[in-house]
Design a protein with these regions (language model features):
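Bacterial Sec-dependent N-terminal signal peptides
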Residues: 1-33
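Extended soluble regions of mature proteins
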Residues: 25-286
Length: 286
């Protein structure tokens, strides 16, 4: 009986270790994408609240331990969700480009993050704008022919409230659960901040979602600060973007994550395509 319990314990420990290893190294094999020139951005709303979320933080008090640092901007008429690390990099590269038209730049200007500078992943390079009951996702990809935008109704997660409470990020929170896009999620929300929003596509609870994660802990979003602001909300003109199906984007992102060398044509010293499979766990399974 003791042997059986120990065997199960070891198996569970190994499974959790594999999940954590994936979460800690989320999408670290694909290089940076072209910058987005912030000089071409336009104002579309005014933000009144900014909520900052750490993605897969090892230490919530150390931003250098995050895969990404993301911002939810709540405006008068719309919301925007985007990567601060990518925005910071685009801004620095835009300034550098004004004085250095050659197109070359220092690696120091690439997005920060625990994976190392300049590594693409879809949660960093997607910008979500919610308005009029829908979310429009603008996706930046390693291959520009797959860049575009797609619309979807504002997701209506079917949350189940639980009696569990805890202090999360300094807020008194209540726990809720849901099944969304093929994964089970747990969220901690606070009515101290009366906003029915959260990170990424999450929302619909009686208060701000402070922390949310999937059951396998591949993805964890945790609030680091909430700010009252009055600042313009900006977005790229996206003049060259075309509509693209969400399914097409998800299919491409699976291919490039599972075998980037094959899709991007990476070659070894002998000219052979470097084809190697890597496990990939997207946040959306359906």
């Amino acid at each position: 009986m003791i042997f059986f319990c120990m065997k199960n314990f070891i198996i569970i420990t190994l499974l959790l270790a594999n999940a954590m290893a994936f979460a800690q190294n989320k999408q670290s094999r694909i290089g940076y994408v072209a910058m987005s020139n912030t000089d071409n951005y336009v104002v579309f709303d005014t933000a009144t609240v900014r909520v900052w979320y750490a993605l897969n933080a090892l230490d919530i008090n150390d931003e250098n331990s995050y895969i990404d640092w993301q911002i939810l901007e709540v405006g008068k008429y719309s919301n925007k969700y985007y990567s601060y690390f990518v925005w910071e990099s685009d801004s620095l590269r835009t300034v550098d480009y004004r004085t250095n038209r050659s197109g070359s730049f220092s690696n120091k200007l690439l997005p920060r993050g625990r994976n190392g500078k300049g590594h693409w992943n879809e949660l960093q390079y997607h910008v979500l704008i919610a308005e009029n009951g829908k979310i429009r996702t603008y996706n930046r990809e390693r291959l520009p022919q797959y860049e575009g935008y797609y619309d979807e109704p504002y997701p209506n997660q079917q949350w189940t409230l639980t009696p569990d409470t805890a202090t999360v990020s300094g807020y008194h929170c209540q726990k809720a659960t849901c099944h969304f896009r093929g994964r089970d999620f747990e969220a901690w929300f606070t009515t101290d901040v009366p906003l029915k929003f959260g990170p990424w596509k999450f929302g619909g609870l009686p208060g701000l979602i402070v922390k949310v994660y999937d059951a396998d802990h591949y993805y964890t979003f945790e609030c680091t600060k909430v700010e009252r602001v009055h600042r313009p909300m900006v977005k790229s003109k996206y003049s060259r973007r075309r509509p693209i199906k969400r399914e097409t984007v998800l299919k491409f992102e699976r291919k490039i994550n599972e075998n980037p060398g094959k899709l991007l044509g990476w070659k070894d010293m002998e000219g052979n395509i470097i084809s190697k499979f890597y496990p990939y766990e997207p946040i959306e399974l359906e």
